[in-house]
Amino acid sequence: MNRFQLLSKGLRLIHKMSEEALAGVPLVHISPEGIFKYVMINVIDGGDASKAVIRGFADCTWHADIFDREEEVFKKLGLRAECPGGGRIEHNPDKKYLKVYGYSQGFGKADHAQTKRILATKYPDYTIETSDEGY
């Protein structure tokens, strides 16, 4: 096997590994209850594949704190991350209710309709509302 064939084989293996890493990334990871900031993150493998995920944590003061935390996780998996926007989530598990609203001063407003669709994959029995009102 020549150098080019070895390099090509190695790149295919790396690409396959990053595809598998991307497939293993959960679509939703948010705090179990409360009102907190969230970001939408586009997670990208070594090729052209990507997926949008939602992350929101009550212990993060800023949208950038959420993104920075998750970006480190994705880097360790060989994945890249971009943040198209954020907002806030109100999560009431007793009422099976989620509200997506507001925006991020640093990243701008996420597509709340897309956020709702992604949240519904983890919370199919919840009422999920969106609003462009509020911060």
From Swiss-Prot:
GO terms for molecular function: protein histidine phosphatase activity. GO terms for biological process: cell differentiation; sex differentiation. InterPro entries: Janus (IPR007702), Janus_sf (IPR038596). Keywords: Differentiation, Sexual differentiation. Substrate binds at residues 37, 104-106. It comes from the Eukaryota. One of its GO terms (cellular component) is cytosol. Belongs to the janus family. JanA and janB regulate somatic sex differentiation. This is Sex-regulated protein janus-A. It comes from Drosophila erecta.
